[in-house]
């Protein structure tokens, strides 16, 4: 997962796919992005947990490096905590019958750095290396986070052929272990493709996969259908629909972002 909470995983994956669809944006540019993600799922339990995730992201894109800082607001309504959702083990029985509780506050802040390791130019091949640190800033008392830092390293490959871009990601994540839990470090990845309809609009599909975080937990498998549209030289919008296929991800979700190039 890209974050301790599943909603963050959606935004991070979608951003990775949409930012590098063809040639990189102009270097030496700052941008600000915000949006909203809503997803819901039972995570193997009997009652749904709803998640609202509102990130604010600042990004600096240089010639070969991209730096990102994401500060999110998080709201969870339901019986599930972050730990149970990560495991894919939603509450059942008496716990699931309890009145849903809404918890909200600061989510986990994420810092990321991406290096363009190879840009093949006319060949259309691009390879990136990304390092991420998820700071445990979300309240573990409220069940909004684990309270621990997580670390991830991933490689990203893009192949542009005409209007079609295919892409894949392979990463490894090291989890911080909260008190009373032993979370496994996991491999994760994604595969997908995007089609450029015109100079302003592209859309596509991506499949996200990940190992289970605990022995009793569930693996991750979800599909995202996304679209991105440039309004002008400074404004860009993005949106997606999610369908989950395992207990380790939401049953479904929707989201949208808007970015402004400074």
Question: What would you call each of these model-derived segments?
Answer:
Residues 1-29:
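Cleavable N-terminal export/targeting peptides
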Residues 23-177, 186-240, 245-253, 257-262:
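Transmembrane beta-barrel domains of Gram-negative outer membranes and organellar outer membranes
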